[in-house]
């Protein structure tokens, strides 16, 4: 059984957090213990408790065990620190240890990335290098919009070039007015080398909703049932 997997997106703001929420809720509905993990979060806000990131808070809220914020998001970067122009080291040992600790506590850990597959951290390294180091299977979120077929195929190819398995993809309808939605899904289904795990419709305030119903549970169980996935 795959205990942990990584969520990437075809771009920034394509819905990685709401898809992560949907996956966590779907797995929890099957009696699984789950935890969300956001190793590096940009654009965090100062609060009385310290820096907090809204995406990480969503993941914390749908984890099935009580976790301190730092266990969900060990590295929170402020808005000023979030630009790649602001150079600072990233403690990869810290985020690896955090992932290992969560993996011991739950059935599944959903690890949400930052930006797209090649988005750079403040040390000018893509987080994907850490994903390769951890040998995490990858699930891709495709924001359904103009140009998404190109972005999805390029992202899938980059993941394969890095030697990691793409175990599935989820379509997120971020543009409700987009024509030819069904045709886009059909083309992606034919061209991507992994199964469609779910389709999220356009929903206002999706990060506050029950989203597990939009995940194809049988397909999700199938891709997670193996001990190890190869490319």
Curated annotation (Swiss-Prot):
GO terms for molecular function: ATP binding; dethiobiotin synthase activity; magnesium ion binding; protein homodimerization activity. GO terms for biological process: biotin biosynthetic process. InterPro entries: DTB_synth_BioD (IPR004472), P-loop_NTPase (IPR027417). It is an enzyme of class 6 (ligase). ATP binds at residues 13-18, 55, 112-115, 172-173, 201-203, 208. It is found in: Cytoplasm. The gene is bioD2. SUPFAM superfamilies: P-loop containing nucleoside triphosphate hydrolases. One of its GO terms (cellular component) is cytosol. Belongs to the dethiobiotin synthetase family. Its main location: cytoplasm. Mg(2+) binds at residues 17, 55, 112. It catalyses: (7R,8S)-7,8-diammoniononanoate + CO2 + ATP = (4R,5S)-dethiobiotin + ADP + phosphate + 3 H(+). The lineage of its organism: Bacteria, Pseudomonadati, Pseudomonadota, Gammaproteobacteria, Enterobacterales. Its cofactor is Mg(2+). This is ATP-dependent dethiobiotin synthetase BioD 2.
